[in-house]
């Protein structure tokens, strides 16, 4: 016991250097000292719990379908509802974080999302499942306070790494739930419950954990380096901001006022365009991740078939000649298509899980790359890191679409996943610089862009799944490569990628 006490005391005793605004200049992963590292670990753990519960229904869907006699359409629509719910919520949560602080908002999301999760066992039909997952989608909004929290606690030199780590490790909950929920389900069955009762009891467990965490963080963590949100230090106003709100007007000439007004208007225009581009690009990385997670195992089953297996074509043509319904044709096609696959459902899911497991380090890798280039190239370095990761993602998606063997597909899939999640890390290493007074709003908008992208990609998948599933990944790759070029038009703190080349030319002139 004494050893444990000494260990905990050591974790709390580590001092962290801070800047003039009170933000941490150091990152000590194995410390839980308040306020910085306590906030870091709290935000990532809460986000992890939110993702675990958000997707907690998915592993139990086969049993739920069996009990409620649900169609594939019901299940597909419930999945769309789960993602769609977070789009508007992420936009709303951002301003709420600016107003009340990340701690209270994170607590509110966990407590609110735990209620429908705990009541999941009461649903009776497909409509009930759709409505249920719509409300459980509240938990998807936890991403915004998670990123907001670390942006408030860490300064510009390490905020990219901090944001990437909490985001990536939080996303791991989406993979962990496919291990956790089946284990709870089997444990309840082992205790004597039948499978229909077991899933209803199993969903209560993550709901209970979310509820406990939602209450606990109110008393064990801080909103900002100063503690409560009301004591936070606001970003320093520039002379421009001061002129706009009317202070020091007497010190300015009329010409200076007009210049400031035009400058502010130009700055706001660039802010809007930058936020829009980041929303689009987050849809090209996080949106791709969410969409890929929902279709990847099916793609592998469709793609890799036993050579010469034509059972599907024969039986489908026979069914069509007999005049059966479209629904029967589709079900027959799906069953035979799986029969011809080299993989079974378990092995396909195992391979597909690799895509999500890269969150353990890949998102942080993107943030670290952004921080490293920032030290040498300043803000243009962050923009270059962002564009390189997106371009790499696009190239790997195109290569993956052309793979015809399972080993090569696994290798390219893993590399592609690293680029996808690294791009997510570089995206949110840029967010704190867009408008420092509105980090929460911008984080919410960008996060909503990711979910919007996921819905768009899933809609395209529906159109291509029966024609050429590989084309879906090819289209994604082309879109991502094109979207990466938009980075050239991002302007943050009056800096673009082009400023790097201008500075190089200026240095050469000075040397001459």
Can you say where each PLM-predicted feature lies in the sequence?
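Structural signature of the two symmetry-related core transmembrane helices
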Residues: 104-118, 380-398
